[in-house]
Amino acid sequence: MRVVYSVEEVEIPKGVSVSIERTGPFDYIVKVKGPLGEVTKEFKNTPVVMSLQDGKIVMEVFKARKREYAILGTYKGILKNMFLGVTRGWRYKLKVIYTHFPMLVKVQGNQLVIENFLGRKSKITLNIPKGVKVEVKGKEDIVIEGIDRELVSTFAAAVQAATELHGDERPSPHGREGGLGVVDGIYVVGYEHIKS
């Protein structure tokens, strides 16, 4: 069933400025500025019409079906994350877990380097995206911070995925004699805001 018209409004927090630029018939660029910096997102081929009205971002959709409602909800979540990013920031925490071969994780320039994963001689290197700050605390903790949640969470997931075993490398989930198997890796253990 189609609904002729639906609208969602997102309140702009105090201390945050927003600009919406229409770049094509169905394309928008939204810029959000706050005390911690600026986040820019591009919305392409969208059925949603965006505008600024009375301190709110108004999103309208015409002849909406389930897909359009889903997009409306997704955009609302993205905008709220942008507001939280420029006012409070995002911090993801990762834990380095190893049982036999001690893994060494360090930041070199704009790369995160993982050495001695499962005793391998080859290094795993990941390029740190612009706008993301990575800090290695001790031997077991990694902290990833930034104002763009999409960038920060995607990089945290990439770090975890870099130490996952795939295909023939992956041992039995029960390991030898019914043990845990290989638990070595880097895992996302939580996230929080930089400012409370």
From Swiss-Prot:
One of its GO terms (biological process) is cytoplasmic translation. GO terms for molecular function: rRNA binding; structural constituent of ribosome. Keywords: Ribonucleoprotein, Ribosomal protein, RNA-binding, rRNA-binding. The keyword rRNA-binding applies. GO terms for cellular component: cytosolic large ribosomal subunit. It holds the Pfam family Ribosomal_L6. It comes from the Archaea. Part of the 50S ribosomal subunit. This protein binds to the 23S rRNA, and is important in its secondary structure. It is located near the subunit interface in the base of the L7/L12 stalk, and near the tRNA binding site of the peptidyltransferase center. Belongs to the universal ribosomal protein uL6 family. This is Large ribosomal subunit protein uL6. It comes from Pyrobaculum aerophilum (strain ATCC 51768 / DSM 7523 / JCM 9630 / CIP 104966 / NBRC 100827 / IM2).
